[in-house]
């Protein structure tokens, strides 16, 4: 299994002005691609912080996906921060420049617009089907680094276009949830651990939906990775069957 790290960049996210839906989308995308999302980082539009985030991410993950900070303004410095992290310089990428010129037909390519074509030589531009700034796909020491715009519709479109580039073999993910009523989370906690011991490779997580001591209700999420979707699905279904059986036993004992 390969590990992934998600980085989001932007003062507006840290201040709470913008809800960080990008991190959720990227995390979900990578999980269903078969990656284990190990770490999420959110940093300011600050060169040192961005550089630190990429260094940390490359220490922890096989694939790193960032969003935010690819535009033409003074505080769009994600690519510069990545270059600093790997000890590289940004250079004008002609393919990226051509993509930008295509977007700005009959409009002057100012230094601010040309900035969006600057990147380290280890990166190649990815055409943005929605906005103007290209995404970047970079390869550093056997790791993939994907740098995406922060505008959600642009980020999503670019990430979807890179699905094949980010595919991995022999790692598939499957999950399923069930609802249980009438059992408190603290009561069911030992059975969650028991199922994880009984079915190798599954992860079981309980999510309380109501106030525990008043009207207990649980959503039980079961997930697994395996070499195929069917193998992961089989593990999850086995675990769910055991969870249902334990829940029925607990509820039956309460009725007696």
UniProtKB/Swiss-Prot annotation:
Protein name: Protein TV0584
UniProt family annotation: Belongs to the CinA family.
SMART domains: MoCF_biosynth
NCBIfam families: PRK01215.1
């Amino acid at each position: 299994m390969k590990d992934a790290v998600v980085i989001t960049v932007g003062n507006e996210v840290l201040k709470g002005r913008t809800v960080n839906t990008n991190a959720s989308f990227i995390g979900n995308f990578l999980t269903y691609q078969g990656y284990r999302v190990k770490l999420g980082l959110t940093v300011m539009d600050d060169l040192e912080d961005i550089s630190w985030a990429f260094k940390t991410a490359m220490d922890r993950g096989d694939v790193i996906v960032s969003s935010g900070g690819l535009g033409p303004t003074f505080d769009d410095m994600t690519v510069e921060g990545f270059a600093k992290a790997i000890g590289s310089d940004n250079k004008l990428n002609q393919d990226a420049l051509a993509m930008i010129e295509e977007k700005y037909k009959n409009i002057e390519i100012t230094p601010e617009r040309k900035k969006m074509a600057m990147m380290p030589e280890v990166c190649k531009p990815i055409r943005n089907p929605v906005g103007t700034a290209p995404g970047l796909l970079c390869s550093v020491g056997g790791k993939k680094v994907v740098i995406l715009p922060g505008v959600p519709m642009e980020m999503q479109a670019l990430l979807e276009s890179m699905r094949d580039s980010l595919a991995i073999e022999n790692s598939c993910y499957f999950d399923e949830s069930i609802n249980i009523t009438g059992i408190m989370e603290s009561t069911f906690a030992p059975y969650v651990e028991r199922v994880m011991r009984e079915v190798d490779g599954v992860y079981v997580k309980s999510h309380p939906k109501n106030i525990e001591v008043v009207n207990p209700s649980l959503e039980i999420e079961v997930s697994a990775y395996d070499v195929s979707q069917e193998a992961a699905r089989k593990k999850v279904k086995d675990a769910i069957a055991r969870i249902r059986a334990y829940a029925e036993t607990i509820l039956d004992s309460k009725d007696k």
